[in-house]
A protein has these predicted regions:
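Core catalytic alpha/beta fold that binds nucleotide/phospho-ligands
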Residues: 1-125
Length: 125
């Protein structure tokens, strides 16, 4: 069985593939941190967000976890935190790994129950 998750942002479409459930998100770093959204992050998260890149690191990590769960942002936003490089759900460690990286002026996050992730290729169309 193969699992996959798609994401897109400003002309980039990206795909994560795995043997188990996987969540994936990407956001172009040319955007600006959205104050209305920033106010919805937890206080612990806000303490880690000092730049647009930090904002999108937290945003993509959260969204990759939501997609891993198969949920919607609206249903689970307030229950999720991304702090210190780890995902928390309802105040407890979520037990999943998030790999964060930036490439091609884009923030990427992959989430799953994996020991490690590997990047195979980035192709801009």
């Amino acid at each position: 069985k193969i699992h996959f998750n798609l994401s897109h942002s400003k002309g980039l479409t990206a795909l994560a593939v795995g043997k188990k459930q996987v969540g994936f998100d990407c956001e172009n770093l040319d955007g600006k941190a959205r104050p209305a959204v920033l106010n919805k992050f937890s206080e612990r998260e806000k303490a880690e967000i000092h730049s647009t890149a930090d904002f999108y690191a937290h945003w993509t990590a959260r969204e990759s976890y939501v997609k891993f769960l198969g949920e919607t942002l609206a249903a689970s936003w307030r229950k999720i935190e991304y702090v210190g490089g780890k995902i928390y759900f309802g105040g407890e460690a979520a037990g999943v790994k998030v790999m964060r990286f930036d490439a091609e002026n884009t923030a990427f996050s992959v989430c799953g129950d994996y020991q490690k992730f590997s990047l195979r290729k980035i192709v801009r169309m």
